[in-house]
């Protein structure tokens, strides 16, 4: 038996008190523990990347909690055709962040995996994580949370089985990629259309004329997929973007960064990235894409190892924004017109929290949260994983979860409301100066700086105190 935490081959892991259960050995539930004079109870909503991190953090502290997952699986959007309705994986999907930058700090991915594993290995990684830490039997599957509301000094949570339960703390980890955003255009398109959320396989494009709207990661992936068997592929964008390669200088590009970036002034960091990307790929406007109207890292970059070649080969034709649809014709703002059979909207998502209606409703995807987790005026409510970063958010969710676990047990204090509001105000001003104004950039955090911030919030002495792990 090999432990993923340290790869030792003994039954009892030398770096962890946990071990893999045998197929016939049930995992023993952790005992309940009282903190102070009453039981501290919690509820976790969702069993995707952020939910799994949250559940592990609570279980590690012997906190008594319930855990609800709408579907039948752990892993959230990485489970293709997940029956919770939140799946966004497709058959060609691979990680856009490298394996070491994507894994949870407490549970490394196997070293013999590829630099950028496919979706099904990532899904298996979450399954293995849940089993390794004895989390699966804690989850109530196929049970949706329908309502969460504050009542006095606690929270009432109503689930799809008709029960209402009380908790001191609610950890919301349902993700922010479940409610597709589809823009409105003048006219009417009479062909087939769907959101990238519903895309699974390139067979749908065979022999068709395809228009993909949006140049985020999914948009570029889908356009490149379509180029393999479609009659024609057009990729429409309102503005230029910086395209980040997966490799530069012989390494996965995100491995060229280091924890030291948390201590480097942002302009210096930007110059370093610009030099690397320009050497690796050149400028977007020199590779057939529109010139970006912002500097590198001034917006969420798009990662693609294939698009530039597809454009250079003529397999994907870049187009500007759409003016209007008319039947099977699409007119672009530059006056050109193309006939298409399929339109794919790779146009992002709206944050959806229907169970918090009337309690907490994000406007234009804005969520003013202390450390991107805590709403100052709603004590006991935590939002896990509602972040975006240049890199993977998965490891960041574990840093969030460990901090929240410390808050619940009282190991670290919760700042005052005024302190939290001041932090939020400063953070929002900093992000407004750095990023273009759009609904996509309301959750941005800097990968290394955010880890440093979360470790300091736990009193762990900053990022460089112990980079690989959490404790």
Regions found by a protein language model. Name each.
Residues 1-2, 10, 27-28:
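Short hydrophobic transmembrane-like helices used for membrane targeting/insertion
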Residues 6, 14, 35, 39-92, ...:
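Flavin (primarily FAD) cofactor-binding/catalytic cores of flavoenzymes
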Residues 26-38:
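Short, Lys/Arg-enriched N-terminal segments with co-localized hydrophobic residues
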Residues 94-97:
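Flexible "cap/lid" subdomain of the alpha/beta-hydrolase fold that forms the substrate-access gate
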Residues 258:
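Basic, ligand-binding patches in group-transfer machinery
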Residues 424-430:
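C-terminal structured "cap/appendage" subdomains that terminate the fold
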